[in-house]
């Protein structure tokens, strides 16, 4: 029976060895970590991993070792032979034999051995007899139960490099006998695996049974390679202690400072992390985000002062853009403020605004906007305005043509000094001098010097072309070229005088004002020169004859108020130029109101040359029949020329005669001297007769507006005349005698 049962025993033992309970080796708990020395629960089965008589296992944490495939012990009869088969510990445990640390002590030893690597195997135990040899690498002939010292320094088992999972038994794992379970397939070379560490053999570990890897946590599909991209699970499968996590942290820290140019050697992750770039000298390398931000900030600050010409070498940022030691003094090169430098648009605009405030500096002198900036060009020197040109020489006004010889009346009318007119001329000249016409053309402010300001002011043709003499006073004055052609009409005044230059340098506005004033009183003539208003005292009143048409200087061609140069318009007076077209138009309109005399030779019609000297009496003048035709033969030549007895004539309907017919040849009518030509009767003073064609100068004459004579006291229509004094009275304004207005004489009331 015994012999019959013997062949069946291996099968039974094999069956029991497959069971989980039997895999713990012997009777669990009999001896911590191991089975029963020598026999175990099943006699003859042995402990599996222990040599003969060594019942103490080396399970981690007091856990009994799992027997290897060959850990069935010896196959002696009924297992009575020591189970020191090839399986077991075989060559021994090196420095930490199982018997030395039974129980819990063996667990600590195993843990330390697993961490440090198993030491070199000692002298192997006695190989078991028969049985199925294990896959492990049996050691030498060890002595069971004897501690085999390892070779490691300080009693520590040394690391044995090798393929697969290094350890005491290359290719077999930490403990011998595990060859089949861990057939030399490690996850990472140099990383020991064993009990307490997840096995990484095929079909085990994180990827076991998960084809393609884990699913991504945020999508439905699977990531390439089976591991979610960028997910923490990507580290799955790496055993603890491999350094994967630490390497990732180090890489992250290194990325923070920028990758060093020199990667560094091994454990020192390049000095790169400390200093971006190469490391020792800051700023020499590429630089990291922080350096880029600082550079951008410095560039922005530099832009505020303008870009430097020299880029600079880093040094003190922002002191001077680009070069810098002195911040912002000179955009561009620095050193000399404002010399060159491109500057920035904002800076240029500010400089331009400041320069405009004080006036633009002289370009090319010094620095634009600096220094001379306050001196706005040279405009401060307004020429030599004090010298009002040569206008003071108003021609030879005293000789207004030959007007003074109009009939031998009075004090040789037309030749005299000019009386009040001289005062008026002086006054006008003084006013003109107040503005001055300057002699230096092109300098100063407009108006201060001719040639600046308004063209034609001051110098060119000052006062009169040729200054006084040619064309003024003498030739062309009075008779040809003055009185008639060009006077009052276009071309009066003098070219260049008229509008621009009424008052030298006064400009258009002042000219307009002066023209308006001149138009009010009649053009020109107020000042000596060609002005007919004043020159020739004779024409105004002197001698009874003067009041008589044809003889009086008031009208005929040369006479006082109108003749030739005379009249209210001659364009040379203190207000040069007969004023503007407006004045001429106004005068023409007013003259047209009373009719423009044809002028002609005085005396062509009876009454035109009444009594050469004007015999005072009832019917002065040659006569006509008084009272038949109003205004003809009306006495009044009397003592004061023109004073006579007004309204002697009788008109139809007992209507008093109208005095708006001056120049009809009847001297003294209403104090309005006859022979004033243009006025009143139009072409024929007495109907077809009158002054006859050509009496007086066309367009001139005193017209009823300016009754002449010293004693013209009768207003139009019997209205008392308004008193005007001074020069205005002398110029033919009614009431010019006996004015007591003093300094207000001739002034307009407000």
UniProtKB/Swiss-Prot annotation:
<feature type="modified residue" description="4-hydroxyproline">
    <location>
        <position position="480"/>
    </location>
</feature>
<feature type="modified residue" description="4-hydroxyproline">
    <location>
        <position position="368"/>
    </location>
</feature>
<feature type="modified residue" description="4-hydroxyproline">
    <location>
        <position position="102"/>
    </location>
</feature>
<feature type="modified residue" description="4-hydroxyproline">
    <location>
        <position position="720"/>
    </location>
</feature>
<feature type="modified residue" description="4-hydroxyproline">
    <location>
        <position position="363"/>
    </location>
</feature>
<feature type="repeat" description="6">
    <location>
        <begin position="483"/>
        <end position="554"/>
    </location>
</feature>
<feature type="modified residue" description="4-hydroxyproline">
    <location>
        <position position="635"/>
    </location>
</feature>
<feature type="signal peptide">
    <location>
        <begin position="1"/>
        <end position="24"/>
    </location>
</feature>
<feature type="repeat" description="8">
    <location>
        <begin position="620"/>
        <end position="686"/>
    </location>
</feature>
<keyword id="KW-0964">Secreted</keyword>
<dbReference type="InterPro" id="IPR003979">
    <property type="entry name" value="Tropoelastin"/>
</dbReference>
<dbReference type="GO" id="GO:0005201">
    <property type="term" value="F:extracellular matrix structural constituent"/>
</dbReference>
<feature type="modified residue" description="4-hydroxyproline">
    <location>
        <position position="345"/>
    </location>
</feature>
<feature type="repeat" description="7">
    <location>
        <begin position="555"/>
        <end position="619"/>
    </location>
</feature>
<feature type="modified residue" description="4-hydroxyproline">
    <location>
        <position position="441"/>
    </location>
</feature>
<keyword id="KW-0272">Extracellular matrix</keyword>
<feature type="region of interest" description="8 X tandem repeats">
    <location>
        <begin position="83"/>
        <end position="686"/>
    </location>
</feature>
<keyword id="KW-0732">Signal</keyword>
<comment type="similarity">
    <text>Belongs to the elastin family.</text>
</comment>
<keyword id="KW-0379">Hydroxylation</keyword>
<feature type="modified residue" description="4-hydroxyproline">
    <location>
        <position position="189"/>
    </location>
</feature>
<feature type="repeat" description="2">
    <location>
        <begin position="219"/>
        <end position="262"/>
    </location>
</feature>
<feature type="repeat" description="5">
    <location>
        <begin position="394"/>
        <end position="482"/>
    </location>
</feature>
<feature type="modified residue" description="4-hydroxyproline">
    <location>
        <position position="455"/>
    </location>
</feature>
<dbReference type="GO" id="GO:0005576">
    <property type="term" value="C:extracellular region"/>
</dbReference>
<feature type="repeat" description="4">
    <location>
        <begin position="319"/>
        <end position="393"/>
    </location>
</feature>
<keyword id="KW-0677">Repeat</keyword>
<comment type="subunit">
    <text>The polymeric elastin chains are cross-linked together into an extensible 3D network.</text>
</comment>
<feature type="modified residue" description="4-hydroxyproline">
    <location>
        <position position="67"/>
    </location>
</feature>
<comment type="function">
    <text>Major structural protein of tissues such as aorta and nuchal ligament, which must expand rapidly and recover completely.</text>
</comment>
<feature type="repeat" description="3">
    <location>
        <begin position="263"/>
        <end position="318"/>
    </location>
</feature>
<keyword id="KW-1015">Disulfide bond</keyword>
<feature type="modified residue" description="4-hydroxyproline">
    <location>
        <position position="576"/>
    </location>
</feature>
<feature type="modified residue" description="4-hydroxyproline">
    <location>
        <position position="276"/>
    </location>
</feature>
<feature type="modified residue" description="4-hydroxyproline">
    <location>
        <position position="211"/>
    </location>
</feature>
<feature type="modified residue" description="4-hydroxyproline">
    <location>
        <position position="32"/>
    </location>
</feature>
<feature type="repeat" description="1">
    <location>
        <begin position="83"/>
        <end position="127"/>
    </location>
</feature>
<feature type="modified residue" description="4-hydroxyproline">
    <location>
        <position position="176"/>
    </location>
</feature>
<feature type="disulfide bond">
    <location>
        <begin position="739"/>
        <end position="745"/>
    </location>
</feature>
<protein>
    <recommendedName>
        <fullName>Elastin</fullName>
    </recommendedName>
</protein>
<feature type="modified residue" description="4-hydroxyproline">
    <location>
        <position position="192"/>
    </location>
</feature>
């Amino acid at each position: 029976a015994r012999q019959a049962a013997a062949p069946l025993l291996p099968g039974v033992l094999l069956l029991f060895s497959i069971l989980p309970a039997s895999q713990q080796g012997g009777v669990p708990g009999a001896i911590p970590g191991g089975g029963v020395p020598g026999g175990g629960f099943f006699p003859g089965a042995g402990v599996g991993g222990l040599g003969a008589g060594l019942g103490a296992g080396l399970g981690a944490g007091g856990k009994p070792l799992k027997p290897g495939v060959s850990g069935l012990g010896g196959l002696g009869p009924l297992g009575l032979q020591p189970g020191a088969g090839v399986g077991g510990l075989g060559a021994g445990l090196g420095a930490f034999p199982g018997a030395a640390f039974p129980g819990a002590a063996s667990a600590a030893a195993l843990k330390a051995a697993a961490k440090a690597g198993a030491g070199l195997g000692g002298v192997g135990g006695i190989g078991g007899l028969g049985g199925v040899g294990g896959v492990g690498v049996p050691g030498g002939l060890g002595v069971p139960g004897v501690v085999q010292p390892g070779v490691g320094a300080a009693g520590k088992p040394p690391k044995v490099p090798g393929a697969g999972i290094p350890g005491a038994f290359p290719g077999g794992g930490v403990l011998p006998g595990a060859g089949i379970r861990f057939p030399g397939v490690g996850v990472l070379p140099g990383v020991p695996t064993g009990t307490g560490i997840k096995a990484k053999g095929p079909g085990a570990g994180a990827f076991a049974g998960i084809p393609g890897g884990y699913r991504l946590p945020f999508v439905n599909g699977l990531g390439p390679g089976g591991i979610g991209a960028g997910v923490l699970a990507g580290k799955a499968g790496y055993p603890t202690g491999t350094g994967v996590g630490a390497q990732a942290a180090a890489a992250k820290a290194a990325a923070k400072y920028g990758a060093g140019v020199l990667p560094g050697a091994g454990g020192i992750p390049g000095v790169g992390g400390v200093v971006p770039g190469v490391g020792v000298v800051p700023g020499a390398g590429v630089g990291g985000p922080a350096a880029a931000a600082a550079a951008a900030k410095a560039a922005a600050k530099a832009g505020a002062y303008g870009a430097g010409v020299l880029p600079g070498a880093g040094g003190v940022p922002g002191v001077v853009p680009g070069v810098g030691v002195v911040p912002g003094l000179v955009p561009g090169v620095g050193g000399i403020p404002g010399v060159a430098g491109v500057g920035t648009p904002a800076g240029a605009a500010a400089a331009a605004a400041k320069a405009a405030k004080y006036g633009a500096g002289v370009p090319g002198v010094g620095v634009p906007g600096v220094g001379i900036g306050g001196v706005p060009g040279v405009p401060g020197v307004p020429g030599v305005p004090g010298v009002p040109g040569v206008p003071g020489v108003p021609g030879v006004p005293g000789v207004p043509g030959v007007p003074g010889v109009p009939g031998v009346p009075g004090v040789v009318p037309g030749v005299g000094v000019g009386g009040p007119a001289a005062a008026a001329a002086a006054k006008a000249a003084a006013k003109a001098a107040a503005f001055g016409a300057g002699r230096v053309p092109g300098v100063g402010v407009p108006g201060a010097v001719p040639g600046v300001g308004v063209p034609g002011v001051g110098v060119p043709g000052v006062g009169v072309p040729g200054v006084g003499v040619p064309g003024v006073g003498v030739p062309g004055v009075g008779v040809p070229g003055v009185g008639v052609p060009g006077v009052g009409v276009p071309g009066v005044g003098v070219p260049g005088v008229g509008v621009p230059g009424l008052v030298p340098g006064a400009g258009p506005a002042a000219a307009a004002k002066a023209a308006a004033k001149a138009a009010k009183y009649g053009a020109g003539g107020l000042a000596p020169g060609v002005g007919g208003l004043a020159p020739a005292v004779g024409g105004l009143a002197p001698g009874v004859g003067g009041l008589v048409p044809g003889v009086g200087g008031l009208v005929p061609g040369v006479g006082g108020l109108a003749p030739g140069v005379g009249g209210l318009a001659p364009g040379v007076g203190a207000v040069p130029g007969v004023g503007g077209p407006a004045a001429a138009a106004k005068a023409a309109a007013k003259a047209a109101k009373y009719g423009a005399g044809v002028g002609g030779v005085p005396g062509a019609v009876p009454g035109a040359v009444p009594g050469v000297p004007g015999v005072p009496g009832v019917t002065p003048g040659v006569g006509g029949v008084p009272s038949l035709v109003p205004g003809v033969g009306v006495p009044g030549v009397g003592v004061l020329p023109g004073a006579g007895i007004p309204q002697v004539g009788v008109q139809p309907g007992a209507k008093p005669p109208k005095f708006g017919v001056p120049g009809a040849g009847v001297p003294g009518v209403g104090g309005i001297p006859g022979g004033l030509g243009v006025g009143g009767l139009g072409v024929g003073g007495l109907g077809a007769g009158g002054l006859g064609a050509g009496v007086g100068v066309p367009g001139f004459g005193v017209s009823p507006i300016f009754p002449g004579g010293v004693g013209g006291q009768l207003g139009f229509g019997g209205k008392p005349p308004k008193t005007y004094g001074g020069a205005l009275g002398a110029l033919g304004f009614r009431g010019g005698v006996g004015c007591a207005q003093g300094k207000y004489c001739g002034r307009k009331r407000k």
